[in-house]
């Protein structure tokens, strides 16, 4: 996300109207609107690999997988936010009623980049934690094969790291909320870690 807001003091309805007519995606934080930067080959490849694997696993389950063009709406007592996660999964029927955003995700995944990593780990994760339906939050590294999974347990979040290293034989990771297991290597298929970030 770009640090300087492009618009300020917009209502949520005005923001949604702006997004419906904009060729550029924006995230919304309490009336301020921020343009989003484009993604790299590595980022897009990782997100697509994960989304395809999840979609294949969830086919026929009633759960829906969305990639980076679907917003998640977060409403708190005195705050309202709209973010574009790289991947979100919702199994809640109420999300079928809102075609441009979802409010009840079970899983959110962010693919890290140099420009967004601090925000994805910090303020954005704090906002995501306020979503009652969210059971797991995953950060996928783009510099080396590593996934970090945060799982809600009561009032706290448990943390697990899964990585691909030379001393392990085809390791897997598990997303408990979706009963999904996959090889780490499959998520990084066709990824070239030597490509520049920009």
Where in this protein do the model-derived segments appear?
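Gly/Pro/Ser/Thr-rich low-complexity, intrinsically disordered segments predominantly at protein N-termini
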Residues: 1-198
């Amino acid at each position: 996300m770009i640090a300087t807001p492009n618009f300020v003091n917009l209502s949520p309805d005005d923001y949604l109207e702006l997004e419906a007519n904009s060729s550029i995606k924006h995230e919304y934080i309490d009336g301020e609107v921020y343009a989003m930067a484009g993604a790299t080959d590595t980022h897009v490849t990782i997100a697509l690999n994960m989304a395809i694997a999840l979609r294949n696993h969830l086919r026929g389950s009633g759960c829906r997988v969305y990639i980076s063009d679907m917003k998640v709406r977060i409403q708190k007592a005195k705050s309202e936010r709209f973010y574009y996660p790289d991947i979100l999964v919702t199994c809640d029927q109420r999300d079928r009623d809102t075609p441009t955003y979802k409010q009840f995700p079970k899983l959110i995944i962010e693919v890290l980049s140099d420009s967004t990593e601090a925000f994805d780990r910090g303020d954005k994760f704090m906002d995501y934690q306020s979503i009652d339906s969210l059971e797991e939050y995953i950060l996928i590294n783009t510099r080396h094969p590593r996934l970090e999974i945060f799982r809600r347990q009561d009032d706290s979040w448990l943390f697990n790291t899964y990585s691909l290293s030379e001393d392990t034989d085809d390791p897997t990771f598990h997303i408990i909320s979706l009963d999904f297991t996959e090889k780490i290597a499959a998520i990084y298929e066709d990824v070239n870690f030597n490509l520049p970030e920009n």
